[in-house]
Curated annotation (Swiss-Prot):
Claim: Magnesium is one of the keywords in the record: yes
GO MF annotations, alphabetized: magnesium ion binding; nucleic acid binding; RNA-DNA hybrid ribonuclease activity
Listed name of the protein: Ribonuclease H
CDD domains to which the protein is assigned, alphabetical: RNase_HI_prokaryote_like (cd09278)
Source lineage: Bacteria, Pseudomonadati, Pseudomonadota, Betaproteobacteria, Rhodocyclales
C-alpha cells in the first residue's frame, strides 16, 4: 500500500452541555487531497458526536481502503478495539447485562469499519495536534450552524 492509497482520518466531537447541542468534525486526507466534514445535532451527547464523526468520515470513503483514523476519544478507542467484540457476542448487552449505550451508532460504525482496513490511533485532545485542533474547530462549527 503506497501513501497515495492510504487514507488519514482525524475526528472529533463536541457538546455544549452533556446532553445538549453537539457537533462533529472530520478531516480526510488521501495523498494531496483533503476533505472536511462537519455537522450537528440539537440534543445529543459528547460520546454520540465522537462516534458520529468517525461514522460520517468512514462513510465518505468511496471505496475500500487502508489507513489510520485518529481520535481523542478513549470511549471510541476502547469501544472499537476492545468492548465491541463482547457486546456483539452478548447481543449488544454489557457484561452486566445492560443495553449498550449508543448501540445504534456502534452498530453503524461496526458495519463501516468492516469495509476498510483501518488502524485506530488515540491522540491527546487539546494538546496542539494540528489536525485534532482542526477537527475540534469543525465540530464546534457544527454546533454554531445549529443556531443559524
Amino acid at each position: 500500500m503506497t501513501a497515495e492509497e492510504t487514507v488519514e482520518i482525524f475526528t472529533d466531537g463536541a457538546c455544549k452541555g452533556n446532553p445538549g447541542p453537539g457537533g462533529w468534525g472530520a478531516i480526510l486526507r488521501l495523498g494531496p487531497h483533503e476533505k472536511e466534514l462537519w455537522g450537528g445535532e440539537k440534543e445529543t451527547t459528547n460520546n454520540r458526536m465522537e462516534l458520529t464523526a468517525a461514522i460520517r468520515a468512514i462513510e465518505a470513503l468511496k471505496r475500500p481502503i487502508g489507513g489510520k483514523i485518529y481520535t481523542d476519544s478513549q470511549y471510541v478507542m476502547k469501544g472499537i478495539n476492545e468492548w465491541i467484540h463482547g457486546w456483539k457476542k452478548n447481543g449488544w448487552k454489557t457484561s452486566d447485562k445492560k443495553p449498550v449505550k449508543n448501540a445504534d451508532l456502534w452498530q453503524l460504525l461496526d458495519a463501516q469499519v468492516k469495509l476498510h482496513k483501518l488502524e485506530w490511533i488515540w491522540v491527546r485532545g487539546h494538546s496542539g495536534h494540528p489536525e485534532n485542533e482542526r477537527a475540534d474547530a469543525l465540530a464546534n462549527r457544527g454546533i454554531e450552524e445549529l443556531k443559524g
